[in-house]
């Protein structure tokens, strides 16, 4: 086998396997990172596909079958990555339109694109660049129960009094910590926001509503200490991913929360419906996750299931809400985000729903990817419009 063909197969076969996951049911958890990488980094995979085709293009009468294998892999890579890439421009335009309409409906001027205005190919290649951000790690936020809660504080490089964003991590309420999304947090700080990312007690040792109480500990710390750190305690947003988004929404729904804006990425919506119909595929074993978090089954704890469901806290106005869901999310389907948006708006809450068609659950684990950059752009724009003065 000649060297060119060998390299083409070494590149083409595993890349084809990775990208094939993007169009398959996610039966096992290991498939999710592959699906995220395959879509978020699609332009890089497209280049790989073109290289594979270029290497295998030269005719080789001795290795004809292997040559066709390599060309087939290259074609699959180009097609599978291209299906994501072609949807980027209309998705970006639709997201901008949804943001502008949502902000205007809320009575806020649509802020101009800020630090992250467009999709940046260099960022896609080398990652987010935030060299001048100072992070205070392991700050004591307070005690909840018998557990000392800690947080990381990301300081903007600019002088002045900055809006504050409380970041709540995901992880199915049983894993994860405040370091989640640290590159995204640094990017928000670089855009002029003081970011506080806090821990909370985890299931199954601690059941709901312990986690909600822990978020309140972080909120009290922010109100007490933000001014001394260059933050404005009168301009607080709360943001979470997945499990953290559920906690963010419930925190904002509390009476006199003092929160000015809330952002949820792929938030759980209705634990009752999720228990009754976990859906398929179910790589997380949703009922086991709910049992671990809530402390029992729906039959045993029906009121707790309802109380933990954001859908049941939509009947009165909340602060302006930004929801971001992936159209390819097989853990928390887009239809739940659409239902939550409808109910929030019906209850008088100004709500912006951004849909990213190719995005999987936790797509922003690659914050410099296609969906990650789009989400960062929209989050910055939303926070700027709501919080900046």
Mark where each language-model region is:
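N-terminal cap/lid segment of alpha/beta-hydrolase-fold proteins
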Residues: 17-49, 110-159
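Hydrolase active-site cap/lid region
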Residues: 103-118, 249-303
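Short beta-strand element of the alpha/beta-hydrolase
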Residues: 161-171
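Short amphipathic alpha-helix adjacent to the substrate-entry channel of hydrolases
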Residues: 179-197
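Alpha/beta-hydrolase active-site loop
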Residues: 207-226, 375
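Gly/Ser-rich "nucleophile elbow"/oxyanion-hole loop immediately N-terminal to the catalytic nucleophile
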Residues: 223-238
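Short beta-strand/loop motif that positions the catalytic acidic residue
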Residues: 317, 323-325, 329
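Conserved alpha/beta-hydrolase "acid-adjacent" motif
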Residues: 330-339
